[in-house]
A protein has these predicted regions:
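Bacterial Sec-dependent N-terminal signal peptides
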Residues: 1-32
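Long, intrinsically disordered, low-complexity segments
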Residues: 22-24, 55, 63, 79-80, ...
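An aromatic- and glycine-enriched ligand-binding surface/loop that stacks and positions planar moieties
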Residues: 24-90, 167, 189, 193-202, ...
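Conserved, well-structured interaction surfaces
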Residues: 48-62, 86-160, 182-190, 196-211, ...
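Flexible, polar/acidic helix-loop-strand segments at domain edges
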Residues: 86, 91-97, 326-383, 496
Length: 497
């Protein structure tokens, strides 16, 4: 096996970057006709294209594409996948809390995230290969890829805990061996904080224009920084740092909130962010994955994944009697979650359907009736409802009850619900219930649950919800088997797998 093959085999971080034709081209400089990263970057367009390639990986199915729901809503039991035989039963493992180390969806997610990191590192390595008309342009490009890299590491630490941390392009077998080692969670979080801090101090705009709603901004970095700080603060392993981390989260969230392009949140249109024709300009939007309707190469699959079969028939959409798509909301779970009369999210963003004769519910968030079947609905990764509810979380975890209630009620009032004044664990439950109501089908549920509840409490919640196979093993995903066996000591397996 030659060195290049070993690099590809040993570590998915050595994924081919958008700027390189192949690993052999990258390593073999003797070919005068080879296009390598060493001679590829000659213009601003080359750098910009590579930055676009970093963003592109976010859209891969098991990363932030439509299959991302398996790792969040399905694991948290807010969605279910009815066709248990698909993928050799691997899809159903997420519903049943029986995910195995050989699960190909887990491997696909791992590979996609590290491919995205690798592409970001390639851009950072070569960003100074060209000259810029303005230092601000360079700053913005670096900030964009560092935001995406931070988003990658946030997903990794939520899903797997300790993971390899790679902050520069790896080019040798020795470099791979040294990097192919799980680093402490604290190291992963620090990488996120460092990247977000760079973005916040960069020349990026506070918020992007509608035309650039799929690009990083300072507010996006502030929100991500805060989310990572909250995730760390509520991790039992970092109890001693909880107060400090919550202060960091409040600082970043307050900064993000101060830049909001609207007045009273109650007056922000609930449906606008999900209107395929308006979501790019929606006041609530912070960062989206952008798709193009009518395009057979740049369309999104969320609509087909989460909607009834007859998605282009408005009449059937209204009466809700079409067969549900591949992921739907269990009837009893939905009615118990949206159990307050007048909740506009239930009446405007959820519709009733049926699957094999049983009543169920599905989302209208990705509604798109494009007759071509190539849908343009975006994935809204960060929005201001998230900022408000994270402020409620941060204040709750800081024992500032009144402030937590204030931000909780902003979201409730916008949804047509009255203000409430719970305290103690009832306030905690109200905040996270509100998050599940607000963000269902937005790939946040299981990570949110980890922020609100201890491992013991999660075990109790899942068991009471009927997850008979759930145990503390399921708190993290397994390290993919094909990665673990390459370095059993450095890429040690998570407990129970």
């Amino acid at each position: 096996m030659n060195m290049t093959m070993k690099l590809n085999k040993l570590f998915s971080i050595i994924a081919i970057s958008v700027a390189a034709v192949s690993c052999s081209d990258f390593l073999n400089l003797s070919d005068p006709n080879a296009v390598t990263t060493a001679n590829y970057y000659t213009s601003l367009t080359d750098i910009q294209n590579s930055v676009n390639g970093v963003y592109a990986v976010l859209k891969e199915g098991n990363f932030m594409g439509s299959s991302a729901c398996y790792f969040e809503e399905n694991k948290a039991r807010f969605l279910t996948f009815p066709d248990t035989g698909v993928g050799g039963g691997e899809n159903a493992q997420f519903d049943n809390c029986t995910v195995q180390a050989g699960n190909q969806m887990v491997l696909s997610r791992w590979n996609a995230i590290y491919k995205c990191i690798d592409r970001a590192n390639v851009v950072l390595k070569h960003i100074d290969d060209i000259k810029y008309s303005s230092a601000d342009v360079r700053s913005q490009l670096e900030a964009e890829v560092r935001f995406v890299r931070a988003l990658c590491y946030y997903t990794l630490v939520c899903d797997w805990g300790p993971v390899p941390v790679v902050l520069s392009k790896i080019e040798t077998l020795d470099g791979v061996n040294k990097a192919n080692v799980r680093q402490p969670k604290e190291t992963v979080y620090q990488a996120i904080f460092d990247d977000c801090e760079f973005v916040v101090s960069s020349k990026l705009p506070d918020l992007q224009t509608a035309a650039n709603c799929g690009r990083a901004s300072k507010v996006a970095a502030e929100a991500l920084w805060a989310k990572a700080a909250l995730q760390m603060a509520t991790d039992e392993d970092f109890a001693a740092k909880k107060e400090e981390l919550c202060k960091t989260a409040i600082t970043q969230l307050t900064a993000a909130w101060s830049k909001k392009p609207f007045g009273d949140f109650k007056n922000v249109d609930l449906e606008e962010i999900w209107d395929v024709d308006k979501q790019a300009t929606a006041a609530e939007g912070i960062f989206q994955l952008v798709f193009i309707g009518g395009s057979n190469s740049a369309n999104s699959s969320y609509n087909t994944q989460f909607r009834p079969t007859d998605i282009n028939d408005p009449a059937k959409e209204v009466n809700g009697k079409a067969s549900s798509g591949s992921h739907f909301m269990p009837f009893n779970k939905t009615t118990s979650l949206y159990n307050e009369a007048g909740d506009l999210r239930m009446s405007k963003l959820i519709a009733r359907g049926s699957h094999k004769g049983s009543d169920t519910y599905y989302t209208l968030k990705y509604r798109d009736l494009d007759p071509s079947g190539y849908y343009g609905c975006n994935n809204v990764v960060l929005r201001y409802a998230d900022v408000a509810l994270m402020l409620a979380e941060a204040y709750y975890h800081s024992n500032q009850t009144a402030k937590a209630q204030e931000y909780l009620n902003m979201v409730r009032n916008r949804a047509g619900l009255p203000s409430v004044t719970p305290t103690g664990t009832a306030l905690r439950d109200a905040i996270y219930t509100e998050r599940w109501r607000e963000f269902v089908y937005e790939f946040k549920a299981f990570s949110d649950m980890k922020r609100g509840y201890t491992k013991a409490e999660m075990l109790d919640l899942m068991k009471k919800d009927g997850a008979t196979e759930y145990d503390n093993t399921d708190y993290y995903l397994p390290i993919p088997h094909t990665q673990h066996i390459l370095n059993p000591d450095g890429l040690y397996q998570n407990p129970g797998y």
